[in-house]
Amino acid sequence: MSNEKVALIILDGYGIGEPNGGNAIYMAQTPVMDRLLQRWPHTKLSASGLDVGLPDGQMGNSEVGHTNIGSGRVVFQDLPRITKAIEDGTFFENPVYAAALDNAANGKALHILGLLSDGGVHSHIRHIFAMVKMAHDRGIQRVYLHCFLDGRDVAPTSGAGYVRQLRDYCAELGTGKITTLQGRFYGMDRDKRWDRIEASYNAMVCGEGIQDPDPVHAMEASYAAGVTDEFVKPVVCVPDGRIQSGDSVIFMNFRPDRAREMTYALTQPDFDGFRRKTVAENLHYVCTTRYDEKLTDLPVAFPPEELHDTLGEIVSAHGLRQLRIAETEKYAHVTFFFNGGTETQYPGEDRVLIPSPREYPTYDLIPEMSAVQVKDELVKRIRTGTYDMIVCNFANCDMVGHTGVMSAAIQAVECVDRCLGEVVAAAQEMGYTLLVTADHGNADRMVEPDGSPNTAHTTNLVPLVLVGSDLPLRPCGRLSDIAPTMLELMHIEPKPAMTGESLIEKS
């Protein structure tokens, strides 16, 4: 049987929200999507929480969404993966953590670094507690905690409460001292603002900063000065708790981007971001996840799970041609993340990057972004008849949704709808079956209940419309079901690793 041609069109940030004035998708004129929903089989997909490998109730995002779509399975993300390890006890047996604690047991200190909150974006306080418990259970005597304060992913003055929790937990166990405090502004920079990293480094390695033996008092003093958690200036609470040569250091953040610079400053002999007054050499340094592929000398407690037999890999193995196309903002999502977190470009896989507009500071000023250019190039490629599978992302509903500007979000939705109309027409003309869907919601809720702008993703379901086929669909599913559906349409058997289920109703 010959392979059917299939195109997947991902409308980023296009969720199914309440039919009200705060929903840009509902308020927009969308004649194309309306027509598709009226004519073709469609269903609703879960794109958040446990259904995409995130904690229950947590909104999805583009990275997670595309990984689940492209791999055809629920891929547990770092936060629930580590939390699950704590719950089943494997965290406390992790050989990478254990080796660092063994080093500390031989006369060295253990330093635990991490963002102290339950925001769940970069870290989780529960994971820090678990590391203190592991150190206690293994009899580590000198345990020093270097706490970055949040104030972005949680309330701006919630830090004092987290500091109290950690202080009390350490006192209860008789293990660990809060040694330094500082806002994430300093120790978690990601934009090579090395003066910030230097101030943080000097507190942890040199003992320089505001001196206050009481971490809770230090927080209250910062608030009294009008400085909230994110911007708390480095405080040293335990002067003899400096990071010194040969010590063990465990960075508990699981999100790499804001852990990378500090890791380089603490570990790399050729680091040149600033002149280090003191260098702590031969640290037994552990990254909780892989912070940078270049840091090959550092052990990783939870290395990335390798995803094999993804949609792109299977299609390539059948000798078929595929196209990935998006503008800059979502290009990594239809390539790197869609392929399971690997830079590998499979045989027969072509990639097209359309530049996102750079001359505007925010996308509410250009809600069409580069959608028209993406559409034009996609239609041109469709008409060649070259590709057996196409994956395209339109970024607008997500990126403009993030601005919180309702009028711009409506324009973004309408622009995407017009582009979708031309893509569908060309694809049907060339014999493609299309799946029109989204990776998560955003523009479907632009306004909070109190009337303030909502700039975040939503936990709403997302649509999936099967255009060009009257095969009946299951009434609900999740993002990981898209890949097996596409393979069924292409008459290709999925691999066992692809645990998602086809959305096509079994007769």
Short names for language-model regions:
Residues 1-507:
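Feature captures the catalytic ectodomains and active-site-proximal regions of enzymes
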